[in-house]
Curated annotation (Swiss-Prot):
It catalyses: a quinone + NADH + 5 H(+)(in) = a quinol + NAD(+) + 4 H(+)(out). It is a multi-pass membrane protein. Its main location: membrane. One of its GO terms (molecular function) is NADH:ubiquinone reductase (non-electrogenic) activity. This is NADH-quinone oxidoreductase subunit K. It comes from Rhodopseudomonas palustris (strain BisB5). GO terms for biological process: ATP synthesis coupled electron transport. Its EC number is 7.1.1.-.
Length: 102
C-alpha cells in the first residue's frame, strides 16, 4: 500500500464517520440512529485496517475486531432499548425519551 492509498482510505474513513455522525444528529428515529451509529463506527474500523496494512502491522486488524465487537454489543443493547421504549411509549421517536418519567 502506498502513501496515496493510505490517504484515500483515511479520507474515506473520515467520510464514513462524518456521514454516520450526521445521521445520528439529524434523524429522530431510534432505528435510523442505530444504523447511522454503525456507519460512524465503520469509519474508524476502516482507518485501523488501512493504517495496519500501510505499516504491515497486524494490530490494525486486531483493532478492527475490537471495534466490530463493540459495535455488535452496541447493536444488542440499542435494539433492546428500542424494543422497550417502543413498547412503553408506542413510538420510535427519540424525542419521546425526554418526555418519559421514572
Amino acid at each position: 500500500m502506498t502513501g496515496s492509498d493510505l490517504i484515500a482510505m483515511m479520507i474515506l474513513a473520515a467520510g464514513l464517520f462524518a456521514i454516520g455522525l450526521f445521521g445520528v444528529l439529524a434523524r429522530r428515529g431510534i432505528m435510523f440512529q442505530l444504523v447511522a451509529l454503525e456507519v460512524a463506527l465503520s469509519g474508524p474500523a476502516l482507518g485501523f485496517v488501512a493504517a495496519g496494512a500501510y505499516h504491515a502491522d497486524p494490530q490494525g486488524q486486531g483493532m478492527f475486531i475490537l471495534v466490530l465487537t463493540l459495535a455488535a454489543a452496541e447493536v444488542a443493547v440499542g435494539l433492546a432499548l428500542f424494543l422497550r421504549i417502543r413498547r412503553i411509549a408506542g413510538s420510535d421517536d427519540s424525542d419521546v425519551i425526554s418526555g418519559m418519567k421514572g
